């Protein structure tokens, strides 16, 4: 039996239509929503040092959890997440492997707490300069963020 053009068209539509409706009814993919970063800055050390620290506010406006699991920059040999804590009156720093940000919440990277540790700048950075640090998210996406070098907190 040979199909006439209108019958063939109807067959294609009736085959594809359920799949198109199914795809259209799917919830938005997590990739549609990204955390937002505000107030990103790097503290310029008083003297040339092989390490610097980066700070910012990371907000998750999405309906699903997000997590920062790493960072990188072309301006530094290594970038990692760290946390400073007071233990028995002594300030201790430890690396943080995963920084969760709950839906509708924010996390502050600030002096004396969570921060980005920036090791080995490839060239000296001056106050007012800007450089990009890319945050790596747990779902495999990358979030490039522009950081401004400052002598003190904004």
Predicted features along the sequence, with ranges:
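Initiator methionine at the very start of the polypeptide chain
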Residues: 1-3, 30
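Bacterial N-terminal signal peptides that target proteins for export
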Residues: 3-17
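N-terminal signal peptide c-region/cleavage motif recognized by signal peptidases
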Residues: 25-27
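Compact, glycine-rich, soluble single-domain proteins
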Residues: 31-154
């Amino acid at each position: 039996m040979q199909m006439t053009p209108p019958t063939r068209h109807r067959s294609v539509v009736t085959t594809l239509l359920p799949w198109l409706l199914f795809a259209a009814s799917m919830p938005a993919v997590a990739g549609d929503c990204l955390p937002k970063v505000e107030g990103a800055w790097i503290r310029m050390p008083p003297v040339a040092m092989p390490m610097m620290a980066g700070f910012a506010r990371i907000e998750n406006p999405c309906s699903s959890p997000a997590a920062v699991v790493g960072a990188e920059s072309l301006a530094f040999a290594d970038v990692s997440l760290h946390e400073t804590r007071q233990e028995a009156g002594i300030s201790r720093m430890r690396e943080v492997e995963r920084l969760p940000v709950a839906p509708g919440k924010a996390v502050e990277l600030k002096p004396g707490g969570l921060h980005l540790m920036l090791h080995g700048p490839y060239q000296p950075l001056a106050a007012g300069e800007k450089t990009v640090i890319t945050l790596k998210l747990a779902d495999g996406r990358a979030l490039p963020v522009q950081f401004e070098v400052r002598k003190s907190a904004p």
